[in-house]
Amino acid sequence: MTNLDNNNLNEEIKNKLEKQQNQKEQKLIIVIMGVSGSGKTTIGNAIASSLGCGFNDADEFHSEENKEKMRSGIPLNDDDRKPWLSSINKRMIEFLNNENDGANDHVFTCSALKSTYRDQISNNINKDNLLFILLQGSKQLLSERLQNRKNHFFNPNLLDSQLSILELPTQSELSNHHYAFIDISNSVDEIVEEIFNYLK
């Protein structure tokens, strides 16, 4: 093989690697976060449907033990949540590393109540590959929604425990990640439109 052939081959490899890196950098994970009753699943499904992309609800990653605790009205602790958050992070990284799926976006829901929880799910993920959407509303509205929710393992009596540990993003988090804050008193269509304004 001549030097010219080698140069052409090296250039092809370089271009291919750059293309793969650009594809990876263009991928975006949208995390719909907030306490139970804030509408994470409803909004997450609506966003994923509008984008035509994949969707994962954090409930999929809970162990049966975690679900039973919540069903019984027992709040989860940090140890309960650690493997759950690790599983979500693993799925996120799988999405980012899959260069053959043709998808640039993926929506996840996760309560992500504490700063440390958000650190766990965003571990080894580039800032520009991740957008946190925090759904916020009054305790009264959240409670009403939970009381009206059917066939879900989450005990409405756990709302107070979630609100008590909810940590708004710190200044450091706001510098290291992209955040959007959404008022859930608006309609689903209005919320989706507001989120799309952040995505532009």
UniProtKB/Swiss-Prot annotation:
One of its GO terms (biological process) is carbohydrate metabolic process. Gene3D superfamilies: P-loop containing nucleotide triphosphate hydrolases (3.40.50.300). It catalyses: D-gluconate + ATP = 6-phospho-D-gluconate + ADP + H(+). Pathway: Carbohydrate acid metabolism; D-gluconate degradation. Signal peptide: none annotated. ATP binds at residues 34-41. One of its GO terms (molecular function) is ATP binding. Keywords: ATP-binding, Kinase, Nucleotide-binding, Transferase. InterPro entries: P-loop_NTPase, Shikimate/glucono_kinase, Therm_gnt_kin. Its EC number is 2.7.1.12. Belongs to the gluconokinase GntK/GntV family. This is Probable gluconokinase.
